[in-house]
Amino acid sequence: MYTMQSWSCIFLIICSMQSVCHCCDWIRHHYGHLSAEYLSLLDQMGGDITKQNAPVLFPTSLYRHIDDAEFEDKVIFLKETIYQITKLFDGNMKSVTWDKKNLDDFLNILERQLENLNSCVSPAMKPERRLKRYFKKLNSKVLRKMNYSAQAWELIRKEIKRHLQRLDILAAQMY
């Protein structure tokens, strides 16, 4: 009886280690490449990045905090940030003057990153609430308050670029 339980326990440990290792390998070998692609597309899809600042402060303290976190917490943070970014782009984009193909490619790569990161973490793991609140503020104080104008979307593009650059650094530090 105990032998069967021991073997079951060992099997579960090995399976979970393989999942983490697979995730490790994916982050090490693919995350940076896809990140470079979507950062390039983000630059190409519009003109110069606006000099104007968003009325919502960038969550620098969250990034500092996650720098010292465990591997799995970092993966959850990567996943949740990309998820929140994709949610922002579900809004009213009628006034956007960006290159449509580059925008579609950008969003497709983000979705691909999200799928891979989703396979790395348990659905039961909870994301950082402060991160969710930050993106809700970004949505309400920039997009909604500015009526989803082209100027509002340019501010969002600028903020998203900062996030994606910071996520790229975080992922590079994970291995």
Curated annotation (Swiss-Prot):
Q: Which GO terms describe its cellular component?
A: cytosol; extracellular space; perinuclear region of cytoplasm
Write down the superkingdom of origin. Eukaryota
Q: What induces it?
A: In the RTG-2 fibroblastic cell line, isoform 1 is highly induced by polyinosine-polycytidylic acid (poly(I:C)), a synthetic analog of dsRNA, that binds TLR3. Isoforms 2 and 3 are also up-regulated by poly(I:C), but to a lesser extent. In vivo, all 3 isoforms are induced by poly(I:C) (in anterior kidney leukocytes) and by viral infection, such as that of viral hemorrhagic septicemia virus (VHSV) (isoform 1>isoform 3>>isoform 2) and infectious hematopoietic necrosis virus (IHNV). However, induction kinetics is isoform-specific.
Pfam families associated with the record: Interferon
Q: Which InterPro entries match?
A: 4_helix_cytokine-like_core (IPR009079), Interferon_alpha/beta/delta (IPR000471)
Which cysteines share a disulfide bond? C24-C120
Q: Molecular function (GO) terms listed?
A: cytokine activity; cytokine receptor binding
On tissue specificity, the annotation reads: Isoform 1 and isoform 2 are expressed in several tissues, including gill, spleen, intestine, kidney and skin.
GO BP, sorted A to Z: defense response to virus; positive regulation of gene expression; positive regulation of protein phosphorylation; type I interferon-mediated signaling pathway
Keywords (alphabetical) are:
Antiviral defense, Cytokine, Cytoplasm, Disulfide bond, Secreted, Signal
* Its job: Key player in antiviral response. Induces expression of TLRs, including that of TLR3, TLR9 and TLR8a1, and that of cytosolic pattern recognition receptors, including RIGI, IFIH1/MDA5 and DHX58/LGP2. Also induces MX1 and its own expression. In the presence of intracellular IFNAR2 (iIFNAR2) and IFNAR1B, intracellular isoform 3 may mediate STAT1 and STAT2 phosphorylation and induction of EIF2AK2, MX1 and RSAD2.
Q: What else is known?
A: Salmonid type I IFNs are classified into 2 groups with 2 (group I) or 4 (group II) cysteines in the mature peptide. These groups can be further divided into 3 subgroups (group I IFN1-a, IFN1-d and IFN1-e and group II IFN1-b, IFN1-c and IFN1-f). Each subgroup can be represented by several genes (up to at least 7 for IFN1-e).
Give the protein family.
Answer: Belongs to the alpha/beta interferon family.
| Full protein name | Interferon a3
> What gene is it encoded by?
ifna3
